[in-house]
């Protein structure tokens, strides 16, 4: 049985800020503020995507920062009622496709050591555990697992995102 949710992946814009800020508060003990999210939207080295449900509501979102040929996934969050329905995977696959198309050397992320479902998702997408950041998270204090997916690259990467992540949609 297919349990995936039909969502549309689009670049995040200012119209999504309130919903994404609320999602941050629901999902994280130390959430990004609306102002932080707004600043990230304007950052030329960053891209943020939202997954919209059939009614146009934000079901989830993810962010990435790219410097030269390195990508860092900053955030992945999915509304509790939409978890385990393929939303995070769909968001991350857009970033994986972008990374390959722009010859990034790798994508990396951090995840709470206790977040087994997220780690299983990342492993399924080809990320591997490459280290730990001791006591990285607060509320509760916890280690971060550093996970990286490397790409086979031949040549120079040129991965300028532009504010808002133009071109990162499905």
Go through the PLM ranges and name each one:
Residues 34, 38, 113, 136-137:
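Conserved beta-strand edge residues that scaffold enzyme active sites
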Residues 57, 75, 79-93, 100-102, ...:
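Conserved glycine-rich acetyl-CoA-binding loop
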Residues 2-3, 11-81, 92-98, 102, ...:
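Acetyl-CoA-dependent GNAT
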Residues 89, 141-151:
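Accessory recognition modules or surfaces
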Residues 85, 134, 150-152:
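Acyl-donor (CoA/ACP) binding surface of acyl/acetyltransferases
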